[in-house]
Amino acid sequence: MWELVGLLLLILAYFFWPKSKTPNAKFPRSLPFLPLVGSLPFLPRRGHMHANFFKLQEKYGPIYSLRLGTTTAVIVGHYQLAREVLVKKGKEFSGRPQMVTLGLLSDQGKGVAFADSSSSWQLHRKLVFSTFSLFRDDQKLEKMICQEANSLCDLILTYDGESRDLSTLIFKSVINIICTICFNISFENKDPILTTIQTFTEGIVDVLGHSDLVDIFPWLKIFPNKNLEMIKEHTKIREKTLVEMFEKCKEKFNSESLSSLTDILIQAKMNAENNNTGEGQDPSVFSDKHILVTVGDIFGAGIETTSSVLNWILAFLVHNPEVKRKIQKEIDQYVGFSRTPSFNDRTHLLMLEATIREVLRIRPVAPLLIPHKANIDSSIGEFAIPKDTHVIINLWALHHDKNEWDQPDRFMPERFLDPTGSHLITPTPSYLPFGAGPRSCIGEALARQELFIFMALLLQRFDFDVSDDKQLPCLVGDPKVVFLIDPFKVKITVRQAWKDAQVEVST
């Protein structure tokens, strides 16, 4: 009997293990696996997935494979191999696996974040970049960020001497920036629509952060599934909210004055319908559904990520007040209190920029990048990678590699400064906070400006210290789609030098 069982397992393994068209091809070393269930029984049950994958490198090396059900996934944990996937062979690995949960979120592969590699994806991505170019004219983007950062500071000013959790205020400020970019609309802090946007954004991130077997075994979707129902509910609320803003944009649309991502997408749709592009573009890729999913992707990619990093920066500064004081010393010296810090001040506020870079290293926005998919039979290093193989870049491994980083688990902003402290450096190529290549973060330039300007304004005006209850922020984090930090409070104190400067201005 056991001989028959063994034979059956071997037969199943033969049919389910990927085949290569290249004779004698060498595959990445694999975790053990069983037919149908794959390597699931052999994966660690506890701990964060990115850390577990990193730990497995000790046994299997910087690139290895595993089976998720009947799907092959390759885990990449070294910068040279990661850059090969993302940049050198970026087009070959620019595909996206189609999963049940992501299919619900992207209306079956529309948009830019979760869409598979296609001409439609490339076109929408190009138009999103065009939007950011639009806002770079006359420093519109920087002025908008400064306006929201100033509004945030005005709200925090009312909490002088108190211990508060600032995450909601920060979240709403970032929402307003994204709403302006997407729809040329902004809201007052108490407007209920901001709470609605925060609720569905956090809800989607939370649900996607729970691994669901339905993405490994799609046939399970025929059974009741709480996570799928929650995704449907949050997506429904998101669509209703975005449609309301979208309709307002259509009413105000003026082809002579494009002012938002939605305007650019509407104009592209009109050009395609009138065949004004000269490229024979299919107007159907600009349906309202396509436009709304692309805008929804920008909401998802641009809100939770930036607000989360701002919270992480505050938390690390509370843990490391000497770093905070160094940043404030630079601000006092090079900016003072008579003007608002600008993005150009990066050349002088080196410790602030180094701190931002270090936070993006030690707590990457996404410890595991969204999975890629091989569009063709390809290779990574010396290993053959068959078409349709899923490829997961373990950014955590790159950013915590002891061979590349000195004391990688220690918060050390100075690692991004030269020995004299007078120039910013990147000490190793093993640093990819925004990914790279065709699937790199679309909003990298926006995020860098937001992080710098928000933190420069906040630290110009306030001290943030351990809360009155003496509870330091927990730095373990909760890695969902975005690496979140647990809620925490900080003691807020308006800086005396800032107060004195305001008195001088008013007299």
UniProtKB/Swiss-Prot annotation:
Pathway: Steroid hormone biosynthesis; Steroid biosynthesis; glucocorticoid biosynthesis
Free-text activity regulation comment from the record: Both 17alpha-hydroxylation and 17,20 lyase activities are significantly stimulated by the presence of cytochrome b5.
Chief location category: endoplasmic reticulum
GO terms (BP aspect): androgen biosynthetic process; glucocorticoid biosynthetic process; hormone biosynthetic process; progesterone metabolic process; steroid metabolic process
Group of enzyme by EC: oxidoreductase
Gene3D superfamilies: Cytochrome P450
Catalytic activity: a C21-steroid + reduced [NADPH--hemoprotein reductase] + O2 = a 17alpha-hydroxy-C21-steroid + oxidized [NADPH--hemoprotein reductase] + H2O + H(+); progesterone + reduced [NADPH--hemoprotein reductase] + O2 = 17alpha-hydroxyprogesterone + oxidized [NADPH--hemoprotein reductase] + H2O + H(+); pregnenolone + reduced [NADPH--hemoprotein reductase] + O2 = 17alpha-hydroxypregnenolone + oxidized [NADPH--hemoprotein reductase] + H2O + H(+); 17alpha-hydroxyprogesterone + reduced [NADPH--hemoprotein reductase] + O2 = androst-4-ene-3,17-dione + acetate + oxidized [NADPH--hemoprotein reductase] + H2O + 2 H(+)
Swiss-Prot/TrEMBL keywords: Endoplasmic reticulum, Heme, Iron, Lipid metabolism, Lyase, Membrane, Metal-binding, Microsome, Monooxygenase, Oxidoreductase, Steroidogenesis
Cofactor(s) required for function per UniProt: heme
The enzyme's E.C. designation: 1.14.14.19, 1.14.14.32
Signal peptide positions (record): none
One protein family per Pfam: p450
Gene Ontology CC entries for this record: axon; endoplasmic reticulum; endoplasmic reticulum membrane; mitochondrion; neuronal cell body
Location in the cell: Endoplasmic reticulum membrane; Microsome membrane
An MF annotation (GO) of this entry: iron ion binding
Family according to the record: Belongs to the cytochrome P450 family.
Function: A cytochrome P450 monooxygenase involved in corticoid and androgen biosynthesis. Catalyzes 17-alpha hydroxylation of C21 steroids, which is common for both pathways. A second oxidative step, required only for androgen synthesis, involves an acyl-carbon cleavage. The 17-alpha hydroxy intermediates, as part of adrenal glucocorticoids biosynthesis pathway, are precursors of cortisol.
Name of protein: Steroid 17-alpha-hydroxylase/17,20 lyase
Organism whose genome encodes this protein: Mus musculus (Mouse)
Gene this chain is encoded by: Cyp17a1
